Design a protein with these regions (language model features):
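Short hydrophobic/aromatic patch on the recognition helix
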Residues: 61-72
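Amphipathic alpha-helical segments used for helix-helix packing
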Residues: 116-143, 189-194
Length: 222
């Protein structure tokens, strides 16, 4: 069983085919990898997966094309490593939430993950521009995705849902995690203009807090 968000993150990123974390800060490779991930993230956001070009990424990063392959096996591993780096920015906030009182954890977790879905540029590109990443999606091993979902569901149930629900069986709790996942995906699909329509401006912070509150109360009242 995964006990902490860091353990969950390490377990998921250890899966073959889902990218790799950067070498530890201070290592000889760290600075190069950090630059590559930063530049590659920008290229993937601008051009999508298929049109992003390794040679152009290397050029903008100021290194030789061959150097990329010393750190990342191929373009797919580089892309997923960019996703990992983006998601790793969430860890400090989620680690703090793990120390909250049980009644407060779920809502805080929802607020952070919903906010991430609205602001994480590469994740949003992957969700809202599926046609630009279709080639990548087709390459992913279904077993890897199944393991990823299983580990994430286990964490949500054990750490966030079970402590605040007492009348639900395992299937009910899995259904709740599916709802949370679908809500997060739906937010990722929202275009930025949805929050900036003339006369209908919606503060993203207010939207996130309200949605998290509704889901949190709904779960606790079941």
């Amino acid at each position: 069983m995964t006990n902490t968000i860091v353990e969950l993150f390490d377990k998921i990123t250890a899966e073959q085919g889902l990218g790799r974390s950067l070498d530890h800060e201070g290592s000889a490779n760290y600075a190069v990898q950090k630059t590559l991930v930063k530049v590659a993230t920008d290229h993937f956001i601008r051009f999508g997966y298929r049109r992003a070009n390794i040679a152009e990424i290397a050029l903008d990063a100021g290194i030789g094309k061959g150097t990329i392959y010393l750190h990342f096996k191929n373009k797919r591993e580089l892309f997923f490593s960019c996703l990992i780096a983006e998601k790793r920015e969430l860890l400090p906030q989620l680690e703090i939430i793990e120390n909250f009182p049980e009644e407060e954890r779920l809502r805080a977790f929802l607020e952070v993950t919903f906010s991430f879905a609205l602001t994480a540029s590469l994740t949003r590109a992957l969700l809202s521009r599926r046609q630009d990443f279709a080639a990548l999606i087709e390459e992913i091993d279904a077993t890897i995705l199944k393991n990823h979902d299983q580990n994430y569901t286990e964490y949500l149930i054990n750490k966030l849902i079970s402590p605040v629900t007492h009348n639900l069986d395992t299937d009910d709790k899995k259904t709740i995690t599916n709802v949370i996942n679908l809500a997060t995906l739906a937010i990722g699909y929202l275009p930025e203009m949805a929050f900036d329509l003339p006369g209908q401006e919606i503060r993203t912070e207010e939207f996130v807090r309200t949605l998290a509150m509704i889901i949190d109360r709904g779960i606790k009242n079941t």
